């Protein structure tokens, strides 16, 4: 007897455009990525440079990987300190632990700037 399809398998099957009983077409499931934001940063730094779809895929994987590492480290820090909420302090400490030297300093300063901008706009 074949194994039952998981919930993930059912979602993948829903991606195809089929006509349900009520006659309306189904939409494709959206795939979230950082492509738009990576492209915007590229154009700020090098306006005359393009990027291939394979390079964009690699960059997207890289951003997802770094995000997951920072989130996991911040979660660990919150757990160590018996906190149930991850604050900007845990994120900042996680960035300092994960990123090397000068890169961590720049990331922390940019993050602080972004948080300040967000709180002042509220």
UniProtKB/Swiss-Prot annotation:
One Gene Ontology CC term in the entry: nucleosome
Pfam family, one: Histone
Keywords assigned: Chromosome, DNA-binding, Glycoprotein, Isopeptide bond, Nucleosome core, Nucleus, Ubl conjugation
CDD domains xref list: HFD_H2B (cd22910)
Compartment annotation: Nucleus; Chromosome
SUPFAM superfamilies referenced in this protein's UniProt entry, alphabetically: Histone-fold
Molecular function per GO: DNA binding; protein heterodimerization activity; protein-containing complex binding; structural constituent of chromatin
Gene Ontology BP terms: innate immune response
Residue ranges of the region described as Disordered: 1-30
PTM summary: Monoubiquitination of Lys-117 gives a specific tag for epigenetic transcriptional activation and is also prerequisite for histone H3 'Lys-4' and 'Lys-79' methylation.
Assembly with partners or alone: The nucleosome is a histone octamer containing two molecules each of H2A, H2B, H3 and H4 assembled in one H3-H4 heterotetramer and two H2A-H2B heterodimers. The octamer wraps approximately 147 bp of DNA.
Protein name listed in UniProt: Histone H2B 1
